[in-house]
Design a protein with these regions (language model features):
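Charged, glycine-rich active-site and insertion segments that engage polyanionic ligands
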Residues: 1-47, 51-126
Length: 126
């Protein structure tokens, strides 16, 4: 793994915290990602997907021992109740579509806008 990979988990958890708790989530996330290279964005999106899939498993009652990101069990346990199943599923769909957009050479900032706005709709902000 190259050096940037180690930032993906931290950035992914920061994304979820931002879209859930920030008073200005869209502006905050847009400013945070402005200097990301496309490869960094893809790594963060992939990690967000992994987090969301594990959160979904936890929401439906799967034990913490069976999740993929065991290393982040405490972080996942701390946020799982903030994320209803429907928001998680919406988020998974948005990130998967975002990654599809990357493969079709859509501008990465537009993809982040789409993902962020989808999460904010789940929060009831848009």
């Amino acid at each position: 793994l190259h050096a940037r990979s180690s930032l993906a988990p931290e950035r992914a958890f920061y994304f979820l915290k931002t879209v859930k708790e920030s008073p200005v989530p869209f502006a905050e996330w847009s400013a945070y990602t402005v200097s990301f290279h496309e490869s960094e964005s893809v790594e963060v999106m992939q990690f967000i997907l992994r987090i969301l899939r594990d959160l979904l498993l936890l929401r439906v009652g799967v034990s913490i021992e069976k999740i993929q990101l065991k290393r982040y069990a405490s972080e996942l346990s701390a946020i799982v109740l903030q994320w209803p199943e429907d928001e998680i599923q919406q988020g998974i769909k948005a990130v998967e579509e975002g990654l599809e957009g990357v493969s079709r050479y859509v501008n990465i900032h537009l993809i982040w806008d789409y993902i962020c706005l989808t999460f904010l709709q789940g929060r009831g902000l848009y």
